Amino acid sequence: MGNMRRLLIFAVLVILTVISNSKSSYKYDGSLFSSKELDYDETDTKAMGSVFSRYMSDSDAQLILDLDFFRHFFNYAEAYRDGAEEGNLELMKYAVEMVEKLKSFDISMACVGDMMHLAWTGVEYATHVEEHKNCSDCKCTPLFQQKKSERHWIFNVFDAMGKVPAGIMSGNNLWVGSWSTCRKIDVVKNAQGQKWKGQYCLATIDAYERDNPLVYFGNMMSGPPDKHCYDKTVKNVTDDGFCFALFPVLKFGVCMPNTCTNHDVKQMLSFAIRATEGAVGTKSVCNVDVECRAESYSDAMSENGLAMFALYLLIATVVLVTFGTLYDLFIVSKAPQDEKNSSAFNHPFIKFILAFSMYTNGSEILQSKKNDREINSLHGVRFLSMCWIILGHTYYYIGTSLTTDNLVPTLINFPKQFHTQIIVQAPLAVDSFFFLSGMLAAFSFFKKTMKADPNHPPKLSAFNWQTWPMYYYKRYIRITPTYIIVMLFDVTLFTYISNGPFWRPIERQGCSIAWWTNLIYLNNFLLQDQECCMGWTWYLANDMQFHIFLMPLLVIVFLKWGMKVGLGLSTGLIALSSLIRLIITQIYGYPPAPILTAKLQIVYQLNDYWNDVYVRPYIRCTPFIVGIVVAYLLNAWTTREQKDLKIKLERRTVIICWCTSTVLGLYSVFGLYWFAKTGDISKPWEILYTIFGTPAYALALGWVVFACTTGNGGPVDTILSWRLFVPLSKITFCAYLLHPIMLQIYNLSRPQPFHFTTFIQMIRYTVEAVFASYTIAFFFSLAFEKPLNKIDEMLFNSKKMMNGENGNTTEMVPLNKIRNSD
């Protein structure tokens, strides 16, 4: 591993050699470059290799960890910059010669010409410095300063490039340089007024799989830090030509002229790397990817038709919201009550305009009145679970964005701390929303059937053939429009919202291929081998599938055959789900849960674990089923005449249930601590957690909600039923859709790498993320979610949509009862 990284240092040196400030006695002549692209000459590799062979012979460094190596390396690299400043014509001449070698590569003539202009400007700068040394007349000083100022931009090119940063020993592979310095370079290069403009390019260099650093990371904290570089007991995998793709061995920023394409820069880097590998006699770099970011007309938002459509949609929405709010405040609210009930105010166009009123929509969201016949504790469960998810995603997106300069030691030490199991097990929070989803929808069904007046048949019937198709339709139509708008903004407007060395379009590539799988809620099955679109929405796919298959099955069984059969079927489905999970994890050697351990090799498994286990509905269905069971029990154990849902239980029963629930909850969250800390787990404990980990959490949460709803929750109910959670709960669906986008924008917009420090640091970032996500979700709900729901009610109200030809009606479950959010 040390040798591999050392080679990358050499590659950087070659790049700096080629493009640093230079000098030559030659005159710069653009006619030297023909449009014909020549084949690569291997003699260039040998020539360049000899340069570095001489350098290596002068260095005592054998490892990347040797600081003397870096001192020699940067002294050598800085010599080119100093050569221009000190007027070293011989060194500048050598730089021009090296640039001329680029003519032999598959590089565009415009790029080579600008590279030569850079080198020749260095020659001119050095020449003026040399001339000024021999000038005794003070009158030549102003002229020298003018010429020096005109050519001083070449040092910005050098300064903008990546340098070896601090933290090399802790795996800092982000040598990003200065994006802003490079982008500011804009100088006239000839009499025709053509310009030399800087563009920032980030090179990603991948190692071979045989040099997989994860082989060493598990034990790198013991013994000398370089022991694995010479330890003969460490056996590399066969050189099968595969690249180590989990993360790059180096990300290196270079400043290039904007005439160079990604391909051009890749060719120059490949030349440098091949030269370095030729010098040491081994191949260490498997692949080089380059992404250059230059402002071009074709990249402008005005040239993106879909982005312009999204922009016009946003503008139109702002206009509608403004007009609807003003009309509501100054016309409707001041009109007498009898006029409000008139046909004029009930005209479809007026209703359409008022659907966008921030005043009315905001009042509805902020309304925090509680109802004794509702499950008030679910508001707190929903919001706190969303905070838990944001906490986990804060860590996840910082880590997976590969913008952290101390990622390796953080990943090694993170799972060893007991309190961090709360973050490691954050995926359990998703189970909270599966539970809420099943419980709320089932509760509404059971309430309207089991608590119906005997003298008046219930409007809602689980056995009516119209009920379930319309239930599916209403669920789809209430969720999908908001989902589509978030997706549209994500792949268009959010692409242009920021910039920087790490910035990239967040979901454009994945959504351009897989968007349709999201709209049919099968993105947890289809195109799993490709980049997904809004990967966090796998939850919506699972949730929709649960409502299509499990909801009618269990509701009908409970209503037709009663509690015993319903509980028996529910238990059987949960046992079958756990058994399937156990079989898959044992066959493929997956961990019992998607957690990080001290042995980082587990990262290899988590990607396949995602596809085979994490997003599969037949494995994630347990909390949804438990939610339906709790909903049935709440309705079965209360009477229609009750004004609330209180159930009197014996004190001993309540204490036993709370103790059991606490044990189950702690087991589900902290039960794999030793596995996370050491990377080792006994087979019995692994099987036990695989089978009971998820059901334990679902049962614990089920008791908490049941106890709080029936009056046995005590202070827990007081906290979860806090009125402040009510409005926050209402916008959690939008917060769920938007918060990963906010986190990615934040992580990818930084000009410099992120540095992990303490747990408190991440708590602060999480609080900021929660605040930002819910603030944006509030306005997004005002502008899109609430208006779309009201328009849906206008177009497809229950009487028009549900009346059959025989006059029977089926009342749909209200939106706030069927939709929940992750």
Curated annotation (Swiss-Prot):
**A single GO molecular function term of this UniProt record:** lipid binding
Q: Domain of life, per the record?
A: Eukaryota
Q: How does it sit in the membrane?
A: Multi-pass membrane protein
- According to the record, what happens upon gene knockout? Increased resistance to fluoxetine-induced nose muscle contraction. Slow development, embryonic lethality and defective yolk transport to the oocytes leading to accumulation of yolk granules in the pseudocoelomic fluid and appearance of pale eggs. Reduced level of sensitivity to dihomo-gamma-linolenic acid-induced sterility.
Signal peptide range: 1-24
Q: Has the keyword Acetylation been applied to this entry? A: no
The similarity annotation says: Belongs to the acyltransferase 3 family.
What is the stated purpose of this protein? Plays a role in the uptake of a range of molecules including lipids and xenobiotic compounds from the intestine to surrounding tissues. Mediates transport of lipids from intestine to the reproductive tract. Required for efficient yolk transport into oocytes. Vital for embryonic development.
Identify the Pfam families for this entry.
Answer: Acyl_transf_3, NRF
Q: In which tissues is it expressed?
A: In L1 larvae through to adult, hyp3 and hyp5, the most anterior cells in the hypodermis, and in intestine. Other hypodermal cells show weaker expression.
The protein, known as: Nose resistant to fluoxetine protein 6
Source organism: Caenorhabditis elegans
Q: Name one GO biological process term.
A: lipid transport
Q: Which UniProt keywords apply?
A: Developmental protein, Glycoprotein, Lipid transport, Lipid-binding, Membrane, Signal, Transmembrane, Transmembrane helix, Transport
